[in-house]
Amino acid sequence: PAIILNNQISDRYYNKNACGTHITWDSIRALDDYYWTDYNESCLDLVALANISDNMNITSMSTRATINIGLSNINNTMFDTIIKSQEYSMKGIVTPHNVAFSVTPLINAFLRLATFEERVLLMNAFCGIDHEVFEYTKRGEVFPIEENIYEHMIRLFTSYRGKQNRMRDKALPILMKEAEQQY
């Protein structure tokens, strides 16, 4: 069986400014109420990340509150590691703006260029499946160092973000030239 929720066409779903993750979280909240459990609060930080990354309208009080509470209570180790890796560009302050312009671009670049296996690693990292150890040999070094999945993902994020930027910089003059020829 499947549960299908479409907040855009349902008369019973009040928040039209929520992303799919937020709607799923609302469903988890309802299940928590029904079964007397409390799983929903542990993933509120990821709901905030999804609402920000999907560029959702935060005029909805529910969406805004979810973002504010989620960013104030970061529980997910992968999300926390990404934030720490961007501490300099974020000036040590976690805001929706800083997440949108420092965290989201890293994740997006990675997802655009990563292999299927690397995407599975990212899912494992966000799910806290962190038993795997990776070996990495720095440029100019002889001996490899060991890194956990979170360190490994940050290195991949940074690498793919740089690669994406180089691809953009290489393509931009070509696109500009084509645009000038057309207009």
PLM region spans:
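Hydrophobic helix-and-loop "lid/oligomerization" segment in the mid-to-C-terminal part
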Residues: 32-183
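Short alpha-helices
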Residues: 2-53
